């Protein structure tokens, strides 16, 4: 992918992730763009990988769909072979390896969060294959606005309700300033009981 096309592709979206004591919250806007064209106003940018892992997606839609499908298949295969759910870190590492192997062809950035036997965790995986563990972070063109709020208001002892409210607030701040983000906020909460998604 040319640098010019990649620059246009990566100019939309705001996704947010944060970790609590026993949960992970993911949030994303709903606007899908192609350059400055609004291609869709009701896009789900949060996807379920397994019963205890979800991810946000940013970048080229087709690339993201292929990567998500691969991660789902690998998670199911792991569970079939071992009888256990794939650890969150393993899913993030696999995504990183795939993106590294196919760079610069695949243009995807993900936040991968979940709860497993090690507790809650959140990983950021970029299109170069870089993977980092985070307490809170954001991706996309609206991320500078979202991160500036998270820097000031995130606490490790947030309740689930407080964390959801903070994630929504962070995305909404980006919606107010970033033309590549818009149309409302979707939320996923991940606990040991599973994943709950809703539109707010």
UniProtKB/Swiss-Prot annotation:
It is found in: Cytoplasm. It catalyses: Cleavage of peptide bonds with very broad specificity. Gene3D superfamilies: Glutamine Phosphoribosylpyrophosphate, subunit 1, domain 1 (3.60.20.10). GO terms for cellular component: cytoplasm; proteasome core complex, beta-subunit complex. GO terms for molecular function: threonine-type endopeptidase activity. It is an enzyme of class 3 (hydrolase). Pfam families: Proteasome. The formation of the proteasomal ATPase PAN-20S proteasome complex, via the docking of the C-termini of PAN into the intersubunit pockets in the alpha-rings, triggers opening of the gate for substrate entry. Interconversion between the open-gate and close-gate conformations leads to a dynamic regulation of the 20S proteasome proteolysis activity. Residues 1-12 form a propeptide. Keywords: Autocatalytic cleavage, Cytoplasm, Hydrolase, Protease, Proteasome, Threonine protease, Zymogen. GO terms for biological process: proteasomal protein catabolic process. The active site is at residue 13. Its EC number is 3.4.25.1. Its main location: cytoplasm. Component of the proteasome core, a large protease complex with broad specificity involved in protein degradation. Belongs to the peptidase T1B family. HAMAP family: Proteasome_B_A (MF_02113_A). The 20S proteasome core is composed of 14 alpha and 14 beta subunits that assemble into four stacked heptameric rings, resulting in a barrel-shaped structure. The two inner rings, each composed of seven catalytic beta subunits, are sandwiched by two outer rings, each composed of seven alpha subunits. The catalytic chamber with the active sites is on the inside of the barrel. Has a gated structure, the ends of the cylinder being occluded by the N-termini of the alpha-subunits. Is capped at one or both ends by the proteasome regulatory ATPase, PAN. This is Proteasome subunit beta 1. It comes from Thermofilum pendens (strain DSM 2475 / Hrk 5). The lineage of its organism: Archaea, Thermoproteota, Thermoprotei, Thermofilales, Thermofilaceae. The gene is psmB1.
């Amino acid at each position: 992918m040319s640098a010019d096309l990649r620059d246009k592709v990566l100019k939309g979206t705001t996704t947010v992730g944060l970790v609590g004591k026993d949960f992970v919250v993911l949030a994303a806007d709903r606007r899908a763009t192609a350059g400055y064209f609004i291609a869709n106003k009701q896009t789900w940018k949060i996807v379920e990988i397994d019963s205890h892992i979800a991810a946000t997606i940013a970048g080229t839609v087709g690339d993201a769909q292929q990567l998500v499908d691969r991660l789902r298949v690998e998670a199911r295969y792991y569970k079939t072979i071992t009888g256990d759910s794939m650890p969150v870190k393993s899913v993030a590492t696999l995504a990183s390896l795939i993106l590294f192997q196919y760079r610069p062809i695949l243009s995807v950035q993900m936040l991968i969060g979940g709860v497993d036997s090690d507790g809650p965790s959140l990983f950021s995986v970029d299109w170069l294959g870089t993977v980092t563990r985070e307490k809170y972070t954001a991706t996309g063109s609206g991320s500078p606005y979202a991160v500036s709020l998270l820097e000031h208001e995130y606490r490790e002892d947030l309740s689930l309700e407080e964390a959801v409210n903070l994630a929504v607030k962070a995305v909404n701040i980006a919606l107010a300033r970033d033309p590549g983000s818009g149309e409302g906020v979707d939320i996923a909460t991940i606990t040991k009981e599973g994943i709950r998604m809703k539109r707010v």
